[in-house]
Amino acid sequence: MKLRKTKFFSQLKHQVLTANQKPFLFYKLTMIGFVGFIILLQVFILRNALNGEMDNTMVANSGFINIYVIRNKGVGFSLLQNQTGLVYFLQGLLSVIALVFLVFMVKYSYIFWITTLAFGSLGNFFDRLTSANDSVLDYFIFQNGSSVFNFADCCITFGFIGLFFCFLIQMFKEFKHSKNQ
C-alpha cells in the first residue's frame, strides 16, 4: 500500500513538473496574474460602484444590455437561493477544480479560458464572502430579458464556452491527423 502511495505521489510530482517547465510556467503565471487581477478588479470596482443602488433599481437603460441592480443569494438564475453553505461549496469547488486543471494543463490554448473560469468563480466567491448578507450583486440584464447577472458570471460563462471550442478544435485536429496517417 505504501509503495502505491509513493508511486502515485512520484507520478503526480512528475506531471506537475512536466506541465510547469520554465517558459510554460511563466506564461501560466502571467495569465494568472494579469487575467486574475483584471477580473477581480472589475468585480469589486463594479460592486463598489453599484453597491449604493437600491435593490431592484434600474440604473441605466442603454438598449441591448441594461443595468438593473439586485442582490442574489443563489447561483445562476437564483437557484439554491436559501442554501448558503451549498452555494459557497459549489463556487469554491469550481474554483479549486479550475485551478487544479490549470496546474496540470499543458496546452497554451486552454490556459486563458481556465484562468477566466477560475477567477470568475473566485470573483463571485469573494463577492459573496465580503457582502454583509452572503449575496452577490447582479446588475446586467438583456433588453426584454429576465436573467440578471454580473461580470464574474460572464467570465464563468465565457470560460466554459472558450474551453468547449478549444476542446472541439483539438478533437478536429486529432481526427484530421489520425485520418492523414
Swiss-Prot record:
Q: In which pathway does it act?
A: Protein modification; lipoprotein biosynthesis (signal peptide cleavage)
Catalyzed reactions: Release of signal peptides from bacterial membrane prolipoproteins. Hydrolyzes -Xaa-Yaa-Zaa-|-(S,diacylglyceryl)Cys-, in which Xaa is hydrophobic (preferably Leu), and Yaa (Ala or Ser) and Zaa (Gly or Ala) have small, neutral side chains
> EC number(s) on record?
3.4.23.36
Q: What is its main location?
A: membrane
> Which residue spans traverse the membrane?
25-45, 86-106, 107-127, 149-169
Q: Does the keyword Acyltransferase apply?
A: no
Q: Give the UniProt subcellular location, in the record's own words.
A: Cell membrane
Q: Name one Pfam family in it.
A: Peptidase_A8
> Cross-referenced InterPro entries, in alphabetical order?
Peptidase_A8
PROSITE patterns membership = SPASE_II
Top-level taxon in the UniProt lineage: Bacteria
User: What family does the database annotate?
Assistant: Belongs to the peptidase A8 family.
Could you identify this protein by its name? Lipoprotein signal peptidase
